[in-house]
Each structure stands twice: as structure tokens, then as C-alpha cells.
């Protein structure tokens, strides 16, 4: 997983860790562990982040460099 991308996209969008923690209904400390790679982020939270940032889970985890979300079927 490309953990650097979590921090990169958050900073690009001018959010603090505490802002994203609220979106994910978790603590800033927990979210920090995700960004640092100390804990694996659950799939449900990745999906929530992808929707929040209007991108794909594939982009967040580094499977693609295309930031646009996948087209809806």
C-alpha cells in the first residue's frame, strides 16, 4: 500500500489529520497510524476516503496514478 499517498492527498486538499479523522469517525492518533504505516487502514475506511476525496481506492493505495474516480457502471 502506498501510505505516502494518504498524506499527500490530505495535504493537497489542505486538511489536517484531525479533519480526516472526523470523516472516518476515528481519532487523530488512529489516523496518524494509518499515514505512518503503523496500522493497516480497513477497507471500509479506504472506500470512505476515496468517496470523500472523489478518487478511487486504487489511487489511494497506489495501484494507479490516475486520480479520477472509476466511472460508474
Named regions from a protein language model:
Residues 2, 6, 56-57:
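Hydrophobic side chains within well-formed alpha-helices
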Residues 4-23, 48:
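Short basic helix-loop element that most often maps to the first helix and adjoining turn
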Residues 12, 61-73:
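Short, charged recognition helix plus adjacent turn
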Residues 25, 44-59:
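DNA major-groove recognition helix of helix-turn-helix/homeodomain DNA-binding modules
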Residues 25-40:
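Recognition helix of helix-turn-helix/homeodomain-like DNA-binding domains
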Residues 35, 53, 61-64:
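DNA major-groove recognition helix of helix-turn-helix
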